[in-house]
Amino acid sequence: RWGRQNVMHHPMKINGQHNEVAVDRLSNPDAYHFLMQSSENLIQLAIQTNTQVLIHGAYNSPVSDILSNYPSIDSARKVVFSRLDHFKSLGGDHVMFENSISPLFDYGDPEIENLIIEHQYRLCYDTSHGFIVLHGDNSKLKASMAHLRDQVVHYHFVDSMGQFHDSLELGKGAIDWQPLKSVVNPDATDIFEINLKDQYKSNRMRASYQYLKASWQTSG
């Protein structure tokens, strides 16, 4: 099940701020233009090169910041989905959307997941983000991964204590990995998106691969 695919990550920041899909077009036109243009350019490149683009549905803007530009979380989420619909229409099978710890595009709430399924998005599932949203509940993480399984095309396998964004090596956090084998889409690709002290040393990623391999071999 260990396939290969080139995945381009859209720019994470502009002027020191996260490149949020929900950026307000009126109050921050430069960031809005950057979001749209960079995403559209990468999608075109992915089509030309038969590769993939990963776009974060959101990052982690404080709710207070979101509500300074939108009347409610729901209205901001509708803007996010509208823009993701646009990127989906351009990219088709060359674009995917990753979950965040923001209520604008998170996995773990069945109602939001149902909405995501209705929009037929191709998904990247970051396990640490889902675990944090679910406050470290392993049974709910498994249920979420099972619910979205058929639409997931790429995984970020990352451990976490489930309290904040810690990006831990597998086996160093609180995620129970063994039961997750049955709810992972076997056709999806994956990476171990672990925080590295030295970007030129991938030992923690390789250790995570070995940990998951051993865990899933014993799960039958």
Spans of model-derived segments:
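Intrinsically disordered, low-complexity regions enriched for glutamine and histidine
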Residues: V7-M8, L54, H154
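Glycine/small-residue-rich interface belts in oligomeric ring/scaffold proteins
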Residues: R1-M12
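Active-site acidic/histidine proton-transfer and metal-coordination neighborhood
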Residues: Q17-L123
